[in-house]
Amino acid sequence: MFLGSAGSGISGELRVVADEIELDRSDIGTSIFTDGMSGDITIVANSLKLNNGSSIFSATSTSILDDIFDDESVPDLLRRGSSGNINIRVRDTLELQGTNFDTNSSISSSVLGVGNSGNISIEASRLRLADGARILTQAENGNVGEINLRITGDMTLDGFQEIGFSQFPTSINTQSTGTGDTGNISIEAERLTLTNGARISTATTNSGNAGSIRVEASEILLDGEILENALQPQPTQITTDVFTENAVVTGLGGTLTLNADRITISNGAQISALTFSQGDAGSIAIQTTELQAIDGTISTQTFGPGNAGAIEIDAQTVRLSDGATLTSGASFPDPFNLEGDRNVGRGGTITVRASELLELDSGSQILGDVSVNTDSQGGNIILDGDRVRIRGGSSVTSSNFGIGNAGTVNLRANDLQIIGSSSRLLAEANGGIIVDPARFTDLIGGSDPTADLSSIIELTRAVGGTIAVDAERLEVRDGGTISVSSGGISEPGNVQLQIGDRLRLDNRGRIAASSVTGNGGNININARNIRLRRRSQMSAAGSPVDPTFDGNITLNTETLALLEGSQIVTSSADPQGGSNIEIRPWENDLVVLQSPDSLINATGQLAIEGDIDVQQPDLPEVDVVDAAAILATDPCATGRDSEFYITGRGGLPPNPESILPGDATWVDLRSPHTATPESTRTRDDETSQLVEAQGWYVNPEGNVVLSAQTANAEPNLPQPQPDSCSPNNSTR
């Protein structure tokens, strides 16, 4: 079914109303080939299926005139046209699947040439796309239409179409290849599922801006990846990209917003915003009750002069496991291309707010990084949660391997735990190298045998980020680490911990500031109680070989305990360096406990001791009382002044030293006259008569038995004999 025009004007509107519509290798479409507009398409049905390469399309192609006539002979007016809108309402299921040779099933509005593409709007109970099926709007030199999907039930995208050695994913996307802006994608669904390489994306490859993506659902699931050409994995993903080989292109990435009760990203799936040009990448905003990433990735990245976008997550619980990654960074596209532009944009800020739990496990990481051979600044990491757990080799890292500075790590929590070997909070700067490409060519080509490597390589200095933690309780144990470090001639940042209650380092837990050749960083800790156990350590260490000013360690605490081989140390190769350890009282109270095998030492490498400044608290004088004057030396004499008085039924001796009286073991205190209620006599009332106990005895099992017979009863229990009492015999 087709409406088209080869001339100017409007091709006409196409409207289809039916109970069930099924297309198999068939099309419904409108098109125009010169200036004008292809008509709108409206479809209303109970169910709609597009099978085996079938399509619904509205298309305009003005560029076809260039193939027929010489470019200069085609007036600009004839180069302009727009495609129509597509509106689909399906009461039950809309399904796109199957291919026909190299054609996949699709719904599209597109313009080839100059002009704007139309919008696509779909309402259905269920939507299913598979086998490389697509919903698409695109334009070359015009604005791209929007895609709006409103699905009351499940919406699924699965798999890909394989043509030759390439795989084309099932997708929903808007794309601009020219100066126009890309359209937005808006999705409302009960449950959105993307699997096996399926994709939702907006992209610009020129000066136009990429569109935004907004998803509202009860549950969002992204799972799996495919191998393109059997070599490179292509993840299941939701992404907005600024992608071009022309670095001067200024198109901006769109915002990616997800709002759902539960979001799961697993088995290589991704949520991303990327830029390869001067335009900034889009940002990612996620609001959910529960976010779980299992070997999944959430990423904003810049590979060009543009800046990476921010990542902002608001949730009750956030769990990253099995190598999952949350990252924002700056990377040089080809670090081995020495003649490339190293002016790479800044990394984005990562913000995670988890009102209940933020957990990283099994090698997962939150990472803000700048790669080698770049001149860029790292983004900051801000984490805010009630409980934060970093374990199983997981890490929160801000790093810079280029020329700029690393970002800071700010963490706020009521309860923070860093558990396990390689689990860490880390801010590091390693600097980089600047290479003169001309001299490098001479060196590796052998044309200049006298070339000196130092003449073409310039070491660069970077500055590490600061780690700032504000928590009620902090525990670092089982090899866990909080660390700022630097390599090359770079300098590390500082560690600043504000702990309201207690700081625990246990079983090789470590807080460190270290440098290879530069100055050391400082460690500043305010905590009411600090305890180091089982070979745990606080360390500020500068260069082991060069004269440097080492970092200081400053502790403000009420109680400091070093036990079982733990250490607080600084070291410096410079006799005039820092290497200070300062311990201050918390609110005028300070207690320092140190086991014999533990160490507080501020000695440099030349064994020149630094300053250990322990400020004594201003304590009031205490009167010491002689304990012998207030403790009794004769407990028996003291006991004679106390005894029990018999005022009830008996059963207790007069005092702890005496025995029970012989006869008075029970007294009946009940009134002698008890009213008897009137009742109807039954046969059971006449069968037996209660007899008052006349005595009692102890049976062989040690139980006391009340008995109506007294002939064989023992008159009394065996009575204990009173013990003698003396100061030397007080144990009963």
Summary of predicted features, one role per range:
Residues 1-732:
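Extracellular and secretory-pathway beta-repeat/beta-biased strand scaffolds
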